[in-house]
Amino acid sequence: MDKIKALDAALSQIERSFGKGSIMRLGQKEQVVEIETIPTGSLSLDIALGVGGLPKGRIVEIYGPESSGKTTLALHAIAEAQKNGGVCAFIDAEHALDPIYARKLGVDLENLFISQPDTGEQALEITETLVRSGAVDVLVVDSVAALTPRAEIDGEMGDALPGLQARLMSKALRKLTASIFRSNCMVIFINQIRMKIGVMFGSPETTTGGNALKFYASVRLDIRRIGSIKDRDMIVGNQTRVKVVKNKLAPPFKQVEFDIIYGEGISKLGELIDLGVKVGTVEKSGSWFSYNSQRLGQGRENAKQFLREHPEIATEIETALRQNAGLIAIELLENAGSENTESDEVI
């Protein structure tokens, strides 16, 4: 009884000092447990993430080599958020955003806020102000590598300033994390890859900006270009692989593959066919694809064209796949196998 009284007194004191709701039992409010998500634009990746998309109120890191599809994936998330009336912002530290390409991916440019800051401090101050407003649903920072500290910009070209960017990111993330959760804003950090010199064992790859982002991120996605898509002799897109390296909301290490078509983005119809064949929703006999005894076409490209002309069948297949999401998720985890290219990079 003394313990209960002491606990009640402590809880009352905390609420008087910091306000009502500053401490509570976890099961007291159901909405505390439920997490809102925003689709990624890729059905297979939504399933692999285990919660139907990228989580709101959390930090997400997308990293990979150059031209692997990092910004494309982030722009798809913005487009999906805008479809549901969300407010989005893009911090273009690289000064490289192509508005024409963004529009082709479905981004509403009239309702997208963009900032092109001069320094890393300025970029992160703008990020903090937007997050604290509580009015932004998705905020993308492109990229961590381009967040150059003011001291580096003001200094000479040959000045050695070790750890400056890592300290900047560490301080910013300490300040941002609580605000991001309270405002239910998803912040996506796009990051680049660097090579560690003298690594004999394990992967020599690492991401820029120190280790802080690896710890604070709830989801980390490793995106790679694994091949080219050709139409006769012309390259029209990339085959892309995404691995969920870290996931605080569902089992990680699931791996998915999809096509990114130039000028179009993620090929949703191609995903429907590939996932459909995996779970048996779409039948494949030789080079012919069929669904519910109806032939979709000979060859993958013809089947995609058929679904493009018959969106109602594409919607039917998508509904069937979402109903089999659990089965697909298990298969994606098995496909990833024991292959773990991250080794010491996974937190």
Swiss-Prot record:
GO terms for biological process: DNA recombination; DNA repair; SOS response. GO terms for molecular function: ATP binding; ATP hydrolysis activity; ATP-dependent DNA damage sensor activity; damaged DNA binding; single-stranded DNA binding. Can catalyze the hydrolysis of ATP in the presence of single-stranded DNA, the ATP-dependent uptake of single-stranded DNA by duplex DNA, and the ATP-dependent hybridization of homologous single-stranded DNAs. It interacts with LexA causing its activation and leading to its autocatalytic cleavage. This is Protein RecA. One of its GO terms (cellular component) is cytosol. It is found in: Cytoplasm. Belongs to the RecA family. The lineage of its organism: Bacteria, Pseudomonadati, Pseudomonadota, Alphaproteobacteria, Hyphomicrobiales. The keyword DNA-binding applies. ATP binds at G64, P65, E66, S67, S68, G69, K70, T71. HAMAP family: RecA.
